[in-house]
Amino acid sequence: MTNSMTASRIHRLTLTHFRNYRAASVTTRGDVIVLVGPNGAGKTNAIEAISFLSPGRGLRRATLDDVADNQGDGSWAVSAEVEGALGLATLGTGIDAPGSEAPATSRRCRIDREPVTSAAAFGDHLRMVWLTPTMDGLFLGAASERRRFFDRQIGRAHV
């Protein structure tokens, strides 16, 4: 039986033309990762990049073309070597430059360099939940909303 609660780990994160990162790659060690730097250094951008390795529009709900580096050709990519319940895998997502064979607004997703139909497939390898200051209503609002949120999170952990 597979343990669906196995912790996911990101061993390497690579960003290409993502927000303020023209090209960046970081290798991580250990279970806890702390991002430290001055305001505007790109800490939140790195977290947002990781959030694109899940279904949806990412942590900030940005449009796909909004996250491209202003100095680039309109394309961007995020990839990560991860370890989770299914072992090691490389997840990648991004968009191609306008004028390439795929429309620029078409997000491509890959697992181990093989195309997958959507980012939902990433959930088999990397599970994440994020809470942002804009979600304060979750804690200040009705208890029924909190229960619904946590029920969804628990349900995802046992899929």
Indicate where each model-derived feature is located.
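Nucleotide-state sensing region of NTPase/ATPase domains
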Residues: 54-145, 150-151
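Pre-Walker A-like glycine/lysine-rich segment at the N-terminus of P-loop NTPase domains
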Residues: 1-52
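Conserved small/polar residues in nucleotide/adenosyl-binding loops
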Residues: 157-159
